[in-house]
Design a protein with these regions (language model features):
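Extracellular beta-rich repeat passengers
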Residues: 1-173, 188-190
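Active-site and glycan-interaction determinants of carbohydrate-active enzymes
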Residues: 176-192
């Protein structure tokens, strides 16, 4: 991933789970590689990942996540966890779009590494970002102001205090039981 040349990558209708957070980052494109676009649609990421997206390409790239569910990710408490999204080697000409996604259990409460489970660690996001109609629940460090580049900058968020009441999250069934949350139609559509 340090010298790869990628054009357009699409991940659609996938479930990716149980990737040990101690083993590394989720989508990992290091400096020296090239990417035109990464589009992730209607997919679920569950249990694992240190930094979820580590995109350090230096060229202009477009990255988007649409209707995805993130469950129990970025929970490793060490200095290698830079939160959910990292695009720190590019410029403001690059784009990161996160739309209609559901986030549950991102990070941990009171971590030693204050960047664990944040949206983007300070200084680790240079792309222009767009966050639209996302839903967050039980993400205690997501908008931590001490080491996050963003502090609750989500102005278009549904009721983040309503428990989604997953049917059986421990077994991988993230079907939403709470009708109020289900009606929001955010996250991977297979679950609502």
């Amino acid at each position: 991933n340090k010298i790869g040349k990628f054009g357009n990558i699409t991940i659609d209708n996938c479930i990716i789970e149980n990737v040990k957070d101690s083993e590394g980052d989720g989508i990992d494109l290091r400096e020296g590689s090239e990417l035109t676009s990464l589009v992730v649609n209607k997919s679920t990421f569950r249990n694992g990942f240190r930094t979820f997206l580590r995109c350090q390409v230096t060229n202009t790239a477009t990255v988007s996540f649409n209707e995805c569910t993130f469950y129990n990710v970025c929970t490793l408490d060490n200095s290698n966890n830079s939160g959910l999204f990292q695009m720190d080697k590019t410029t403001a000409s690059s784009q990161l779009s996160v739309k209609k996604c559901f986030f549950y259990g991102v990070g941990i409460e009171n971590p030693q590494n204050t960047a664990s489970g944040v949206w983007a660690k300070k200084g680790k996001m240079k792309a222009t970002c767009s966050y639209i109609q996302n839903y967050y629940y039980n993400c205690p460090n997501l908008w931590n102001t001490s080491n996050s580049q963003y502090a609750d900058a989500h102005d278009d968020v549904a009721m983040e205090t309503v428990d989604p009441q997953f049917i059986d999250a421990a077994s991988g069934n993230l079907t939403i039981g709470n009708q109020t949350v289900k009606d929001l139609a955010v996250g991977d559509p297979r679950w609502y």
